Amino acid sequence: MRFFIEELPVVFPYDFIYPEQLAYMRELKRGLDKRGHILLEMPSGTGKTISLLSLLVAYLTHHRAEKHKVVYCTRTVQEMSKTMEELKRLMLAWHRTVGGSAVIDDGDTQRSASDVKREASDGAAATALLAAGVGKTPFAAGRRRMAESEVQKGSLGGELTAVCLTARKNLCIHPEVSALTYASEVDAACRIKTARWSGGTSKCQFYHGDIEDLAPSFTLPPGVHTLQDLRQLGEARGMCPYFAARHAIETADILVVSYLYIVDPKVSPVVRKHLRANSIVVMDEGHNVDDVCIEAMSLLVSKSDAQSARDSNVKMLQDALEQAKTHNRQRLQEEYDRLVSGLALTRLAVSSMSGAAREMPALPGVGDGGGELDALPASLRHANQFVTFISRLADFFYRIISRMTQPQTADPSTFIAKIKEDCNIVDVTHLRLTTDRLQVLLNTLQLRDLYAMRHLVIIADFVTLLATHYKDNRYALPGYVVIFEPFDPQDAINRPDPVLRLSCVDASMAVRGLFEGHHTVVLTSGTLSPLDMYARMLGFVPAVAKSFPMTLSRRCICPVIVTRSTEQADLMCEDLTSAYKVRVDDRLQSGVSRAYAGLLLQLAQTVPDGIVCFFTGYKYMGEVMLNWYHSGYLRELSRLKLIFVETQDVAETAEALRNYRRACDIGRGAVFFSIARGKIAEGIDFDRHYGRAVVMFGVPFLPPDDRPLKERLKWMEAVLGITDSEFRNFDAVRQASQCIGRVLRNKTDYGMMILVDRRFSLPDKRKKLPGWIAQQMRDNTNLSTEACVSIARDFFVEMAQPWDQMKDLGRTLFDEAALATQGAMVQGSEPPELAARRHATPLAIGAPIPTAAEGGGRFPAAADGSAMDGPSRPIRAARDPTGTEQRRAAAGAKRGRGST
């Protein structure tokens, strides 16, 4: 369908649209027009991705002269692929709606939505259909003339170029390199085969020089290029898909990338250097963006890293340097001459790299063109002197880590001063150049195995990052802390393995340049409550911030909170929790496990198809399941549904997920045990029969003894005013909301959301739930396990009744006719409620409050007819617009008082 958001013509690839999608696009356009940052929370399953893409493509097309570029960030490769498929379907709709209408007759017939979906899933088939003129929609004469005008002006949406950018592991087509298992191995092998000095059989046949040197024949044509399309195009043209995508960054209108291409200082320059100030950056599923920033800006050096750097990597450098002095001293002299001539070090580092090695750039703040950063001291220009310095640095790290016996925390300035003293460095700015100088030397010496040098590289990155950010001009406290730990926290056995952490405590550090350098950054997700928390943590002021309610014609989601067991004699209400005081008490924990098992067994008999259960962590899940095994609950549960478990092995988890889906497909039913913050909780949808109920056992709090987290919480309380308990509650609820939100993918879907822990019913937790979940929770916030099962039975009986979605037209579902009543089919119009609100006269005293349908309230009407005065507070709409019943009730009360 085609409609207007004010003056903006929007093409939507489906025949129907939700009210939430329409409201979402209006707020998005309002933020784009303001050239400000946008913070939007939209309910899960209401088409957030396609709404974003539809509005952005329309905006790019309408404002083509301004040359906007959209960078769409996702978390996983699977989400990237789904986004590209949606974008391809949208481009097909543009051709059918705008491009096709200019050349077809009114007698042409329209394909069904299912045909369009099937045809759009294959890029080649879609292109062939468009070339043949098949499946084009007839429009009225006025709309036809508009389409012809847009085609003549060159504003057709189909001319946009969209490309996805990901790691070599996902794009490489070299038979040997692509067969490697790990991404780091693929990167190292690619750099070897694309190095300038590689030749003969070791040279990659798909690599044709640096990105800047690629011929025009390697330029991607307009259209949507998915990962599969890039690989097929590379095989057909004999070119590397990875470098073809990199080459297209500058000319592409839409880039779909992972978060790391925006926040990781090692790879973000690849994209950021091509962005203009008017670029639009979208962070989809941005509820964990602060954690992504913290992880990207933090580094860890283990004792084995420091030892390998000192004993192995430094020796490799020294041997290669001696060999170069013997056989090719000219290369070393040329390197020195270029450094002495004043050539900026970062530009020299990049120019000396091979095409593949260019993805090892400077860290943030390095190489900005400033004189002090590019002025390399004389003591580091000679290769001999730099190798001596890097040798001292590696030895310093090894000595520091080896001596640690107790956890310690150091201020960045103190640690920098110690490095300067031990390594004989005068100016701290010289340390900022460590990574770039090492990269220049590695390429000068033509070392092939860069993967083996990773231990020394991480130490150089550590020093560079610390020297760049050891002071912060924005806040009083620095955004980094150096942490010594005698045990690696990732080692479950707690073997003595000391590590040195450079821990980032300020999440805004990774995106500060993004928010300051670009007009619009869109942060959106289904779980962003409370909205102000993200603005405070990331250090920006949103121009538009809104949480949308969910309009439902039937109650297709049923969130409940279970706080107590039916075994009142053995287990009291306050003990049904995963709190530490309960877990360390064997009697209480046994009762909690028994209550969990009783609830799950009854749900397995009530809930059809699939049930997904989330625990707070692997350890807690193991303890509970071990108790169930010894008690016989697992055996009894397996008779009702098959059991699958997420493990820490990626391959095992993927296989378990495949078999779980298969069990649901054949009607056997299954239960999938997973953990919050795990692989399944993020990005895996359990729509339709794959997830008719999601159970969250316990509150997924962050570990209390995590030292980097403690330092981050101290920093946030001192600088941002966010207390320890406030952030822990916020993080736990957003993780739980993300888990239970997996159950709903569209309004025709349905499922139960069950939170099993008494702490979820506390106000400090419940008020942080997304508004669209709290809106449907009603009074189900203090249930026993038996009451929960009773509600589940009633819910699934109700969902089993026949339901015609077409009855929702005009209320929770809009077609073109319904959009016409909203004023969306006329260019430049506005919704009736907004016009009525602007032209409304002031209310007289005693006048009835208008309902949501009449324009009252700041938010759209909720499913039960109530107006939403905020993201999670429904206010009952007036049911007596004339005030008659109110006067009668007052008169009756007066008579009653007189009679007494």
Model-derived features: where do they sit?
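Walker A/P-loop NTP-binding motif
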Residues: K29-R30, T49-A65, E85-L90
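A contiguous, basic/glycine-rich beta-loop/short-helix subdomain that forms a polymer-engagement track
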Residues: L227-A252, V263-K273, E421-S578, V592-R594, ...
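A substrate-engagement module of RecA-like helicase motors
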Residues: R2-V11, D15-F16, H63-L255, L260-V263, ...
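SF2 helicase catalytic motif II
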Residues: L275-A306
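Conserved pre-motif I regulatory segment
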Residues: M1-E41, S54
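Conserved RecA-like P-loop NTPase helicase motor core
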Residues: T563-G591, F644-L762
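Conserved helicase motor "Helicase C" RecA-like lobe of SF1/SF2 P-loop NTPases
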Residues: C613, Y618-T647
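Conserved interdomain hinge at the start of the Helicase C-terminal
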Residues: G513, A569-T616
